[in-house]
A protein has these predicted regions:
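Flexible mid-to-C-terminal extensions adjoining Fe-S/redox cofactors in radical SAM and related proteins
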Residues: 1-8, 212-267
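Conserved alpha-helical substructure of the radical SAM core
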Residues: 1-105, 117-119, 264-267
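Short cysteine clusters
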Residues: 18, 22-25, 192, 210-211, ...
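A conserved catalytic-core signature of glycosyltransferases
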Residues: 58, 194-196, 218, 227
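Conserved AdoMet/S-adenosylmethionine-binding subsite of the radical SAM
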Residues: 65-195
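Short, acidic, Ser/Thr-enriched surface-loop or helix-capping motifs
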Residues: 201-202
Length: 267
């Protein structure tokens, strides 16, 4: 593997399916799909010279994937550092896999459980913390418990990361809105790290510049059909990167994305 990685991270969505329906999560317009093990292997082979750090998440619940163990083994064999974002409803069921193929970090979206009445919170919390204790005891996996600092019930200590114990954290974040070309917000001025520090690959192989493009609106190509070099050198990819060099969004979805305001200091 190349010692110098071009991207700090690449998001790889192994499934677009989810077992919850959260109000804050943008509706997925794509059909439910699971990336096959062979397809995932191809993805890893084709991004290997560009990064050694992947997030198994864009949309969907990665612990739903029936071949999760095989996927994590491919990552392990390729010396990939893996982050995994989950609602943790299946963490007890998938614990043997997570113990056999430990990941670098598991991000638990606690606000997902709070947003779904179908979840028995007592059972959820018990299974989550029991699984966390096992992982912390038997692996080097770091666990980040994420909460959103909402306007309705704000945390007094604001937005920050608090260490509970070694490798276990509470991460309080501000909510964000998924970009939508039909939203009232529109501003072509701004900055984004898409295709500079990160990019995303959807479960059908579609490459997009950013993990907030959950519906593949800015499809740059398909990594199962083309090399990443070919995709990144395409006219659309080049225009995207050149635009943000000038602090200008050229894609309609980016114009309607307020998340780029978080990088205003780079203007």
């Amino acid at each position: 593997m190349n010692s110098v990685a071009r991207f700090k991270r690449v998001y790889v969505e192994i499934t677009s399916s989810c077992n919850l329906h959260c109000s804050f999560c943008q509706e997925t317009l794509r059909k439910p799909h699971f990336m096959s093990v062979d397809e995932f292997r191809t993805v890893i082979e084709r991004i290997g010279h560009y990064t050694n750090y992947i997030y198994l998440h864009v949309k969907g619940e990665p612990l739903l994937h029936p071949q999760l163990g095989e996927i994590l083994k491919i990552c392990q064999d390729a010396d990939m550092t893996v982050n995994l974002t989950t609602n943790a409803t299946l963490i007890k069921e998938k614990l043997p896999v997570l113990l056999e193929y430990p990941v670098h970090q598991i991000n638990v979206s606690l606000h997902s459980a709070d947003d779904n009445d179908c979840i028995d919170m007592d059972s959820y919390i018990h299974n989550l913390f029991e699984s966390c204790e096992t992982l912390l005891d038997k692996t080097e996996t770091e666990i980040s418990l994420r909460l959103w600092n909402t306007k309705k019930e704000p945390f007094l200590f604001g937005e920050k990361i608090c260490t509970i114990k070694r490798h276990l954290y509470i991460n309080v974040q501000s909510p964000f809105e998924w970009p939508d070309v039909n939203s009232t917000y529109c501003n072509e001025r701004g900055f984004c790290q898409g295709l500079r520090q990160h990019m995303a690959i959807l479960c059908d192989g579609t490459v997009v510049p950013c993990c907030l493009d959950g519906n593949g609106v800015m499809a740059l190509g398909n990594i199962l059909d083309s090399t990443l070099e070919e995709i990144l050198s395409s006219p659309r990819s080049v225009a995207f990167m050149e635009g943000f060099k000038k602090k200008t969004a050229v894609e309609p979805l980016c114009m309607h994305c307020s998340f780029k305001e978080r990088f205003a200091h780079k203007m």
